[in-house]
Each structure stands twice: as C-alpha cells, then as structure tokens.
C-alpha cells in the first residue's frame, strides 16, 4: 500500500537507500494511510521548511551509558525521518557542564556535529530578550546542515556585560522560543519520572492533555499535591503515623521535588507550545522510553510518524477498578478516569513500559458545551423562524454562549458529505437535547439527546462530526468522547452504519455492540431490516444491569433503530 503512495505524486528524496527502507518499514508497522500522507507532506525535502524538535532533558548525568548510547541511535533515526534536534540544558548549580559533555557525545555518536551556545538569551539595554535560536539560526537552520545546537541556560546582559544562569526556566524557555526562530514542530521533555501523573491511573502518566482545557485544573492539582507533601503532616496523631513521616522523610522529600518538576514541565509545555504553530506537539516521557529501539514502542518516533500518543486516551476499558480507594496523593478527581489500564494497587508502574510514562500535549482547542434542552432564538444564531418562541418567560443572559446554526449545519454536511435537512432535524431533537459539544470554531461537534420513554430515558449520541481535514489529528475525537464519558458516566448509546470504517474505533470505546436488524420481540414479530449497529457504553454497574434486562435492551434497540435520518432525500432509510 505504501509503495503506491510513494509512486503517485508524493516524492521523498532520501539521501540513501537505508533511510528510505527505514521509512517504509516504520510506516508499514505504525501509521495509517492518512497519517502516512500527513507525515510525507510535512517532512519531505520538498516541503520547503526544516522541521526541528526541541529537547529539554533533566538529570541526564544519572542515566546509564548504555541507555545514552541507545538514545543517540534514536536521535540519528529522528534525523533520518526529517526531524532535526535542538537541545536546551536545564539550569543546575553543578551539572550544566556535565550535561553539555554528555549531549556532545550523544550528538557526535549520532554522526551529527554539536554546536555549543553558552548564552541562550541576550538581554538588551532596553530590557528586551533576544533568542539564540533567532540570532544564530544561520549556523544550523540551513540546507543539509549537520550542526546541532546545544544551549546552556545562561543569559547575557548587554548593559552590565555579564552573564548569569537563569533562575526562571519557564520564562527562559518562553523567551527562547519567541521571535524569528526555526520551525519547531515538537517539544520533548525527558526525565526519570515520565509524564504528568494521574491519580485515576494510579499515578501513571496522563495519555493526552489538551492544555486549553486542562491546564488550570492540572496545575492547581499539582500545586495542591506539593502543598500536601510540604506540610509533612502525619495521617493522624497516632505515634506510628508520626514516626512514619520521620522514617520516610527522604522519600517524601524526593516525591516533593518530583512534583515540582511535573508542575514546571506542565508550565514549560504551555509557554513553549503557545509560541509555536497550532499543530506543534509536546511530549513528556522518560529517557529510558525515549531510547527504546522498537519503533512501535518508542514514543518519540511514533509521535513523529502519527502525531499522537502510543494509545488513545478515550478507551473506556482502561479504567480504575470499582471500589478502589484513592490515596491522599490522588488529587486529580476531576479528570477522566478511563484513560489507561489500571494496575494492582500495590504494583509499581513499570518504567520500561513507555505507555505508562508518556504524556502527549497540545496547546489544544477551546471547548464549549450548550446544555439547552430546546434551541430558541435566544440561545442560538440563525435558527429558522418556525422554531422561535414567545419572548415571554426567562431568557438566557447576554453572556450565555449561543449556538451558531449555520456553522452547526456546515460541519455536519462536510463531515458526512451529505446535506442535513435542518428543519426536520431540529424538529426531531428540540425539547430533548442533552448537550451539544463544540470543539474550537466548529471543528468538531457532538449532539447528544435523550431518547426512549420519558420516565426511563437514556443518552444517545445523535451526531458526531469532525471537519474532514482534521479527522485523526489534534485528538479531537478523543477529546469529544472524553467529555461525553465524563458528562454522562453511566451510559451512552450511539449507532453507526455496518460498513462504517470507523466501527473498529467505536468498538474499542463500547462495552457492547448489537445488530439492529435482529428480531427484538419474537412474540410480536418486531423485526426490521436496518443498516445500523448499536454501540453501548456504560460503567460496569449500569452495563451489567442494562445488558441483562431484555425489556431495557428492547427499548434501547427499538428507540435507536426507529430514528429516521434527517438527510435531504434520505428520510426513508433505516
């Protein structure tokens, strides 16, 4: 399949046969056809720009030499795949020069040429900061240059003709990535602890973070954890609990430092990605994971080829076990709990499993939810007049978000490649809307309704749409499903055509799938041909009860089966 892609208009001028074979091999094992096209269009020599990845590596001096050698091979492989590395050394009173020497060896072993810069920033007499990436890019952001910048965390002050090590690494990195700098497509933070921890995943790393949505909550949670650890308070005044704090003081101190780094990593990601293109991606993982030779398991290589995490963040089978009690450190009680497989409570996370220690981050997209049961002219824009209501009664405030009906219809039309009968559709859903989720500027949308009997209704995903050019990118689908599962944690149903190529993705996010063509009630011959399958998601408690209740199942299936599509000229399809 990939050979046909290369043969028809997607040129990739590789310097040698081994690198071409590498690309073919990796694409065959890790990427979809769409991802392959996206990768080739971005990272080919014909794309007209040089793509860089910015590395920020903590405690490199603590990493075993064998791991460093493997990491050097990964750096070389990233370069062959079209991503040029750039390194920034974290500030440290004692280890900056050691880290510089180690990076020099890593770059040299990768057959590249290290280019050392002592000052990353220059502070002008006017107080403005100028980045070495902008001032000195002529040395490394050109043609087939093999020069790789290694930047120390120093600032040169023009007014005093002196230099100093930065004390604010977040501000340093923020200024470093401003101005006319080379195109940075990836920002990688490597350390010994891995990605941002999630209490719901037994302190394994979050899979994906949409910073626009989650930064405030996560930074607050991390700060709260740090505050809790700083107090060194025993669980009670019991003598054993007080002794526990004393005996484990070194462990607590180490954990406190680790959480400080996690918070700093989160803030670094937000500042750096804010200065880069909207498509730029951040990734936090361990040096050990980043050094893995397997292209399927190496989070850096995999993200380069697919622009996503090693696994999806919206898989509902990956959840905390029922009845599991949170530890005092699990402060993330407002984030999705179904991101990854739970482990035994006493089982330590394996640092060798890249899935458990890797977080992918995007600056992300803004999200709006419209919890209006009925659409009116007061909560929407462009609503057909037949759905206008009397001005009597309560109106939403002027600050309440209004749904743009024209954009609402446009994204559905584009995503499904057919025209929505707007009047028929609004007539069907009005009065029973559960919520409408809108991603960005109507780049993704989900319309959920209440179906079934009034006394025993259920939540139904009526429409799920993403703009065609964004399908598979930015994690929009995962973001929408995460929000749905969080907003309606008990159960959600949806249907899909039997031949829909997305059904495998739907299947992974459901706990049951039923064919709507089956006879729902043999005694009364309730059988109709249907081109749809029913997908059911529910937490274990609800799912166990609903899937064993034949009457409830019949209500699910009959209600969903008998919904008439609201496409123009297709209302008789079922």
UniProtKB/Swiss-Prot annotation:
Keyword Metal-binding: no
Subcellular location(s) of the protein: Mitochondrion
Domain N-acetyltransferase: 392-560
GO biological process, one term: ornithine biosynthetic process
Pathway field: Amino-acid biosynthesis; L-arginine biosynthesis; N(2)-acetyl-L-ornithine from L-glutamate: step 1/4
Enzyme Commission (EC) number: 2.3.1.1
EC top class, as a word: transferase
Coiled-coil features, chain-numbered ranges: none
One Pfam family hit: NAT
Catalysed reaction, written as an equation: L-glutamate + acetyl-CoA = N-acetyl-L-glutamate + CoA + H(+)
GO molecular function: L-glutamate N-acetyltransferase activity
InterPro entries (alphabetical): GlcNAc_Synth_fun, Vertebrate-like_GNAT_dom
Family under the similarity heading: Belongs to the acetyltransferase family.
Function comment: N-acetylglutamate synthase involved in arginine biosynthesis.
Protein name: Amino-acid acetyltransferase, mitochondrial
Record organism: Saccharomyces cerevisiae (strain YJM789) (Baker's yeast)
């Amino acid at each position: 399949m990939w050979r046909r892609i290369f043969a028809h208009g997607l040129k990739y001028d590789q310097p040698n046969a081994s690198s071409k074979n590498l690309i073919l091999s990796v694409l065959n094992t890790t990427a979809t056809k769409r991802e392959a096209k996206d990768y080739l269009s971005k990272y080919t020599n014909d794309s007209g720009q040089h793509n860089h990845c910015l590395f920020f590596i903590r405690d490199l001096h603590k990493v075993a030499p064998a791991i460093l050698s493997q990491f050097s091979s990964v750096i070389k492989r990233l370069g062959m795949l079209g991503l040029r590395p750039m390194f920034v050394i974290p500030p440290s009173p004692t280890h900056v020069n050691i880290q510089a020497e180690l990076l020099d060896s890593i770059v040299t072993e990768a057959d590249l040429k290290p280019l050392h810069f002592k000052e990353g920033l220059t502070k002008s007499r006017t107080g403005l900061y100028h980045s070495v990436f902008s001032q000195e890019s002529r040395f490394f952001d050109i043609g087939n240059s093999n020069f790789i910048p290694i930047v120390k965390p120093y600032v040169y002050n023009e007014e005093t003709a002196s230099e100093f090590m930065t004390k604010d690494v977040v501000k340093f990195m923020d200024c470093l990535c401003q101005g006319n700098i080379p195109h940075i497509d990836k920002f990688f933070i490597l350390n010994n602890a891995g990605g941002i921890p999630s209490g719901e995943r037994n302190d394994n790393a979050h899979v994906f973070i949409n910073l626009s949505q989650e930064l405030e909550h996560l930074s607050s949670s991390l700060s709260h954890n740090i505050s809790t650890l700083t107090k060194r308070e025993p669980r009670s005044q019991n003598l054993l609990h007080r002794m526990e704090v004393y005996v484990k003081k070194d462990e607590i101190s180490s954990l406190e430092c680790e959480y400080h780094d996690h918070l700093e990593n989160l803030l670094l990601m937000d500042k750096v990605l804010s200065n880069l293109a909207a498509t730029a991606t951040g990734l936090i993982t361990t040096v050990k994971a980043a050094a893995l030779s397997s292209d399927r398991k190496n989070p850096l290589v995999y993200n380069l080829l697919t622009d996503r995490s090693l696994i999806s963040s919206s898989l509902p089978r990956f959840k905390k076990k029922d009845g599991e009690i949170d530890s005092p450190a699990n402060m993330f009680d407002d984030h999705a709990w179904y991101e990854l497989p739970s482990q035994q409570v006493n089982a330590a996370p394996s640092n060798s499993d890249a899935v458990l220690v890797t977080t992918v981050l995007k600056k992300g997209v803004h999200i709006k939810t419209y919890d209006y049961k009925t659409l009116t002219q007061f909560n929407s824009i462009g609503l057909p007049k037949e759905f206008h209501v009397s001005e009597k009664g309560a109106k939403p405030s002027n600050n309440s978000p209004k749904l743009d009906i024209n954009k609402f219809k446009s994204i559905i039309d584009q995503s499904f490649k057919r025209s929505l009968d707007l009047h028929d559709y609004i007539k069907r859903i009005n009065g029973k809307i559960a919520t409408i989720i809108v991603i960005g500027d109507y780049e993704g949308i989900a319309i959920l309704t209440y179906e079934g009997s009034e006394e025993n209704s259920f939540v139904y995903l009526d429409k799920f749409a993403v703009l065609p050019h964004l399908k598979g990118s930015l994690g929009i689908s995962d973001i929408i499903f995460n929000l749905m599962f969080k907003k309606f944690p008990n159960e959600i149903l949806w249907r899909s055509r039997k031949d829909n190529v997305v059904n495998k993705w739907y299947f992974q996010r459901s706990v049951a799938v039923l064919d709507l063509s089956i006879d729902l009630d043999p005694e009364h011959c309730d059988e109709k041909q249907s081109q749809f399958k029913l997908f059911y998601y529910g937490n274990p408690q609800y799912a166990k009860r609903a899937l064993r209740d034949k009457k409830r199942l019949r209500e699910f299936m009959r209600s969903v089966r008998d919904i008439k599509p609201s496409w123009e000229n297709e209302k008789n399809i079922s």
